[in-house]
């Protein structure tokens, strides 16, 4: 979720190999298959007064690649974003349009914290968004399937 230490996927995978970690994978322009599901996603983008078009298009492209890879598996797709692309009346159309184009109907996300927002349920144009920030789920793992 807060992967500020991320450098490159190649370096991260080398670290896993060097340390013999075989139960961890990274989603970066791809998907991961886990227990009969294709897990897809990207960081996404949050609403700013001045959005950065370069970052926004990059994140939309990464989500497109990840969901396309997930579709190729033929498995049900679980979609995760760090930033929600829908929050209240705000919609990040560049990201949301990728989700709609791929027929995704449930997206899990983090980023939002605080007691007042934890009970907010978000749905937009047939897509449900579920907030999984640690403080909003009492620091308890959430069973999602």
Language model regions located:
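Conserved catalytic scaffold of divalent metal-dependent phosphoesterases
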Residues: 7-98
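Active-site neighborhood of phospho(di)ester-bond hydrolases with catalytic His/Asp-centered motifs
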Residues: 1, 25-29, 78-81, 104-116, ...
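Catalytic PLP-binding core of fold-type I/II PLP enzymes
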Residues: 97-105
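Gly/Ser/Thr-rich beta-alpha loop segments that engage phosphate groups in nucleotides
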Residues: 1-2, 43
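Binuclear metal-dependent phosphoesterase catalytic core
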Residues: 10, 33, 101-102, 115-145
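Flexible, glycine-rich phosphate/dinucleotide-binding loops
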Residues: 4, 48, 138
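Active-site loop signature of alpha/beta-hydrolase-fold enzymes
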Residues: 4, 86, 115
């Amino acid at each position: 979720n807060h992967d500020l230490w991320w450098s490159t996927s190649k370096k991260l995978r080398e670290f896993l190999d060097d340390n013999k970690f075989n139960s961890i994978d990274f989603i970066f322009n791809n998907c991961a298959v886990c227990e009969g599901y294709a897990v897809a996603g990207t960081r996404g983008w949050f609403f700013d007064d001045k959005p950065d078009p370069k970052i926004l298009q990059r994140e939309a492209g990464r989500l497109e690649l990840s969901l396309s890879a997930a579709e190729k598996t033929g498995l049900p797709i679980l979609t995760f974003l760090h930033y929600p692309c829908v929050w209240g009346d705000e919609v990040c159309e560049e990201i949301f349009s990728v989700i709609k184009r791929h027929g995704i109907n449930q997206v899990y996300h983090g980023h939002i914290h605080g007691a007042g927002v934890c009970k907010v349920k978000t749905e937009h144009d047939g897509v449900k968004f579920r907030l999984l920030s640690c403080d909003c789920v009492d620091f308890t793992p959430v069973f999602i399937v």
